[in-house]
């Protein structure tokens, strides 16, 4: 979203090149290594919800972040019209993320005024974590470029629906590209494997 600009995600290290243990990517990589030792791969998809405002970040700061103007004026969950009314922003998010090789599946209105959701296609856990960071950076900066504002806060308004971040998790075999969760055991109408049962509840 900025011409002639590169955004680099990297791992912090000591002067000797040792990864910083408490860095989020180091922590996640350690967990991935533990999973891979079991011949498994963790696959993740992300759904992030956020509120959009026609108030700029500067204007919001000047009013102590009160009385912000929602990008939508009614609850738009699955409503056809409101999607077009915020396409200037959501469309830009999708385009810029796609240009950065972050595959967006969809955007949609949610159950709060100006609330939306952006879904990213699943990938391996570390790549998804990086995509998650890029998504939030993109949404905030592109909103700012358009005189708008966005927040991923869980509950910015007590009178509106809250925002969440849904993560879809599955375990795959390292030997072949198979999701190990489907199986023969029925739970609540789903046919699942023992791997899924252990993953879900430890039983």
Where do the PLM segments sit?
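Glycine-rich, acidic/polar active-site loops that bind/position phosphate-bearing ligands
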Residues: 1-203
